């Protein structure tokens, strides 16, 4: 089974509505697979990282509220040998360093159509 990280942008620019939409998507994903949730703003609070077990339902939660640095979850994923990472974000931060795992992005329509940086990685827009 692939080791997947879901990095959730907790920065102040991510609205509560967007955070709720992200958790809605994750509740759907949890019907299919287990994954590791990696919350971040400018850093990853490692005591807040947890495994979301297959079949669990969770409510949206915000555990921090600073700026945004995509290098924080990228470094965490690289250090912990994940196979893939999906970053849930509003895309409002500079482009991160390279990731050893396959990386993709999930954002809203605005973030997908007007991202802060260009990437060849897959970007999925949710409503």
Where are the regions that the model predicts?
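Acidic, low-complexity intrinsically disordered regions
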Residues: 1-127
């Amino acid at each position: 089974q692939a080791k997947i990280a879901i990095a959730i942008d907790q920065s102040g620019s991510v609205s509560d509505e967007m955070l709720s939409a992200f958790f809605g998507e994750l509740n759907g994903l949890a019907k299919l697979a287990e994954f590791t949730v990696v919350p971040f703003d400018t850093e990853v609070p490692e005591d807040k990282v947890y495994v979301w077990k297959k079949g669990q339902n969770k409510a949206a939660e915000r555990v921090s509220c600073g700026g945004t640095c995509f290098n924080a979850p990228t470094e965490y994923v690289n250090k912990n040998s994940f196979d893939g990472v999906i970053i849930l974000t509003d895309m409002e931060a500079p482009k991160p360093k390279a990731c050893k795992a396959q990386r993709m992005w999930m954002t809203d329509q605005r973030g997908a159509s007007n991202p802060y940086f260009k990437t060849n990685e897959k970007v999925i827009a949710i409503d």
